[in-house]
């Protein structure tokens, strides 16, 4: 089942700790969140030279808004949340983030794209961040469903962050 999740982030002075709340004991979810933080530590300077993973502590709270269980596809949304708080830039309003990244930044396409878009619509999203690798699957979704969104394609993890934050 496809769900809706909200991430809320906080940044504090510190020494590079990353705390995740709301994931309970789900190891795969924690691993996905850690993937994002490790990616940021290794590649943050490619996003912005002002991001510090050594002098700041980060906290992200994960909320399952529909109570269906937490998704394991948290690396990309976590990376976007971390960059948002680190740069002091909010994400675009009414944005849904689809897709996932690996530790190396490889984009993973969206499973069940038509169903995922329907959940986005039902949840009030107006903009959908989508990996370019899923563009070929748009034919599986009804045209009137696709027409409900401003689709924003990304080609890399950095591109996804820039697009989510509305940075050119």
List each model region and its residues.
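Peripheral, non-AAA+ core regions of ATP-driven protein-machinery
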Residues: 1-168
């Amino acid at each position: 089942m496809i769900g809706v999740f909200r991430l809320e982030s906080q940044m504090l002075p510190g020494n590079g700790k990353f705390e995740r709340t709301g994931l309970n004991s789900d190891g795969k979810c924690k691993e996905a969140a850690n993937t994002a933080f490790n990616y940021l530590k290794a590649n943050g300077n490619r996003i912005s030279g002002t991001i510090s993973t050594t002098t700041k502590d980060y906290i992200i709270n994960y909320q399952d808004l529909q109570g269906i269980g937490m998704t394991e596809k948290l690396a990309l949304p976590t990376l976007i949340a971390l960059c948002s708080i680190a740069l002091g830039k909010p994400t675009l309003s009414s944005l849904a983030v689809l897709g996932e990244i690996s530790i190396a930044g490889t984009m993973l396409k969206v499973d069940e794209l038509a169903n995922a878009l329907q959940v986005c619509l039902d949840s009030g999203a107006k903009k959908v961040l989508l990996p370019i690798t899923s563009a070929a699957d748009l034919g599986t979704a009804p045209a009137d469903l696709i027409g409900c969104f401003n689709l924003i394609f990304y080609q890399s993890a950095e591109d996804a962050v820039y697009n989510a934050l509305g940075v050119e």
